[in-house]
UniProtKB/Swiss-Prot annotation:
SUPFAM superfamilies: YebC-like (SSF75625). One of its GO terms (biological process) is regulation of DNA-templated transcription. Its main location: cytoplasm. It is found in: Cytoplasm. Signal peptide: none annotated. Belongs to the TACO1 family. One of its GO terms (molecular function) is DNA binding. This is Probable transcriptional regulatory protein AAur_2300. The lineage of its organism: Bacteria, Bacillati, Actinomycetota, Actinomycetes, Micrococcales. It comes from Paenarthrobacter aurescens (strain TC1). Keywords: Cytoplasm, DNA-binding, Transcription, Transcription regulation.
Amino acid sequence: MSGHSKWATTKHKKAIIDGRRAKSFAKLIKNIEVAARMGGPDLAGNPGLELAVTKAKKTSVPNDNIDRAIKRGAGLTGEVVDYTEIMYEARGPQGSALLIECLTDNKNRAASEVRLAISRNGGTIADPGSVSYLFARKGVVVLPKNGLSEDDILMAVLEAGAEEVKDSGENWEIHSEPSDLQAIRDALKEAGIDYETDEAEFVPSMQVDLDVDGAKKFMKLVDALEDLDDVQNVYSNADLSEEVQAALDSE
């Protein structure tokens, strides 16, 4: 799930790693195909493709797979790549809100599978606009702290368009407008600071704390959604207190 690192830490113990990795590869490949279709196969002239390829390489997607995806998306193999982006809105346990971002070649299948996963796992599908207003599209760069202070990060990226630096446990998160992501990446490289991920994400304006029971139900719902091939990202305003996280980690 895109968003808070506490979820990633907790879910890591419960995930079947190889299966998740394979699904992650497939979703990264789909992003490359779409970017190549929209802007062509040249990384230098297609920032969206360059970003998709960089992300895939950071996740160890083999170069051969990346090259084939670029050619397929750009129409150089004769195959037709035609995906549609769809966003679904949902309510989860204890007032939590979710945005489910899909990339699909079959809208009816995606709608049916997403609705079924939500209804079977304690959520409810929401009307368009009733959840999305709780989120804003932001560029998010995540980097390990590695002894760096908030001021160290701000000095490196403030002039590149960074809006804020947030403490996210073991990591720092830099938030910006999505259009400033490239400038922030360049500023970090110039400062010699390594980062882990850089994404355009939907960031909640406020977060909702879940108790242990709510967190378990929420993770079950998100797992079911992320298992769907058409689902690219799940964004939420759900959060965990340190006490709830400790209780989950102890199980």
